[in-house]
Amino acid sequence: MVVANPKRFTVLLSDEQDGWQQTVHRLLQPQGVQTVTARNGREALDLIQSEMVHAAVLDAQMPVLGGMQVVKMMREMKSAPPAILLTSHLTDHLLHEALGMHVFSVLSKPVDFNLLLDSLARVLRRYHENRWPGDG
């Protein structure tokens, strides 16, 4: 686990596969957005409870706890970050469940980085005083 710098936005990237997390980190870092990573749902919840996380990107199929299980547990917290859910098996049922739990966005895997960055920019603008790094 990586500790966040409180002066910037922090995005949680949670998936057991490291490759896309590293790519997203490299894309967000120049924007002034820091990332913290978790390899399973339990680590994701621990980071959400211990760090100031502004948005959480969660894989629906993670070990220990899946992304929707994490979202359900986050909703019981006092101040949970908005979530973006990634899935390689998008179904109407999953989409309905995710939207019912107020997931901000559901994206298919493999991850389209442009869509993910756009979703992150929208979620940070919406939930954090319309501020995206570089906005005037």
Role assignments for model-derived ranges:
Residues 17, 61-64:
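The short loop immediately C-terminal to the conserved phospho-acceptor aspartate in CheY-like receiver
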Residues 18-36, 101:
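Two-component/phosphorelay signaling modules centered on CheY-like receiver
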Residues 37-55:
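Acidic, metal-coordinating helix/loop segments flanking the phosphotransfer/catalytic sites
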Residues 40-43, 65-69:
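Acidic catalytic/metal-coordinating carboxylates
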Residues 46, 68-79:
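Short amphipathic alpha-helix used as the core "switch/output" element in two-component signaling
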Residues 63, 87, 110:
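The feature encodes the CheY-like receiver
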Residues 69, 90-106:
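Alpha4 helix (beta4-alpha4-beta5 surface) of REC/receiver domains from two-component response regulators
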Residues 93, 111-121, 128:
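C-terminal output helix
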